[in-house]
């Protein structure tokens, strides 16, 4: 959607603030968790919690975008030197009080959507939900400024959503019975999604240094940041391969077709090096991430049909 002629607090402003292009990062882990359940349990999967998990993830991603927009604006991080996509509060599209109300409202809606999951996972789901909400707020408010963002991405865009989605969608079983295959795929998913954060922070390294935001890329430097980006994608495929032990092995290797796209994007990242042109790399990284998710899901489904 065109970001010109945006009226304050209009529907167009809210659509842009929700940043719909980021929703794939929330959808992919849930897709993989559902696919794992289908591969291991076939027709026994429970589709109601699958839908609820997807809705919860998407709403929480929008909430995280609102939180990020609001608190970065209040901290002065989003100024005229920002290289990334335009933010609603800093552009004046949405007033700070309206954004504050919106982020609280979306948090409440996410909690309401997630509440029925207690029926499938027990009261433990309250703790999981609270952890997601705390992560949503603390990431922008403080943790991303301490270089902990990448660890949190591995946990809350990998281990938690994939494993919890699998556990809720699969037939009722103890929490600690989640197969190692699912744990491995959740870790691989987190590694791939972290490439998005790495290229985002790589693009913003100079601005983050200036504003005191100590991201991991600021700490390790641009050169090591590029290396980290490359090896995250490679490590994801290695982890994915190591945890493949279903009888139908070859479909589990489908995610390897992600690597050529990832390496090509890495080379473009090295070539561009600095500036707003890195937004092209960010877009291609998001594409690669979604491709990885689709390949992994396809591998799971094929493993069921080929056993």
Briefly describe each language-model feature range:
Residues 80-120, 213-248, 286-287, 292:
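Multi-pass membrane catalytic core of lipid/isoprenoid biosynthesis enzymes
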């Amino acid at each position: 959607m065109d970001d010109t002629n945006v009226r304050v607090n209009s529907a167009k402003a809210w659509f842009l603030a929700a940043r719909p292009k980021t929703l794939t990062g929330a959808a992919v882990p849930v897709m993989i968790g559902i696919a794992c359940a289908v591969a291991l349990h076939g027709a026994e999967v429970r589709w109601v919690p699958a839908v609820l998990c997807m809705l919860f993830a998407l709403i929480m991603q929008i909430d995280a975008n609102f939180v990020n927009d609001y608190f970065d604006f209040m901290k002065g991080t989003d100024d005229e030197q920002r290289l990334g996509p335009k933010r609603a509060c800093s552009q004046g599209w949405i007033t700070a009080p309206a954004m504050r109300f919106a982020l609280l409202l979306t948090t409440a809606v996410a909690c309401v959507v997630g509440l029925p999951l207690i029926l499938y996972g027990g009261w433990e789901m309250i703790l999981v939900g609270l952890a997601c909400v705390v992560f949503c707020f603390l990431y922008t408010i403080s943790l991303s400024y301490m270089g902990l963002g990448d660890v949190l991405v591995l946990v809350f865009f990998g281990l938690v959503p994939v494993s919890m989605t699998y556990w809720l969608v699969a037939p009722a079983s103890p929490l600690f019975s989640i197969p190692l295959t699912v744990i491995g795929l959740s870790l691989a998913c987190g590694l791939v999604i972290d490439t998005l954060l790495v290229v985002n922070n790589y693009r913003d390294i100079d601005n983050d240094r200036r504003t005191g935001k100590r991201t991991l890329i600021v700490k390790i430097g641009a050169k090591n940041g590029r290396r980290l980006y490359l090896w995250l994608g490679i490590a994801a495929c290695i982890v994915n391969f190591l945890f493949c032990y279903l009888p139908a092995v070859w479909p589990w290797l489908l995610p390897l077709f992600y690597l050529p796209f990832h390496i090509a994007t890495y080379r473009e990242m090295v070539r561009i090096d600095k500036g707003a042109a890195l937004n092209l790399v960010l877009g291609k990284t998001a594409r690669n991430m979604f491709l990885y998710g689709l390949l992994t899901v396809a591998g799971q489904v094929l493993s069921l049909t080929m056993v």
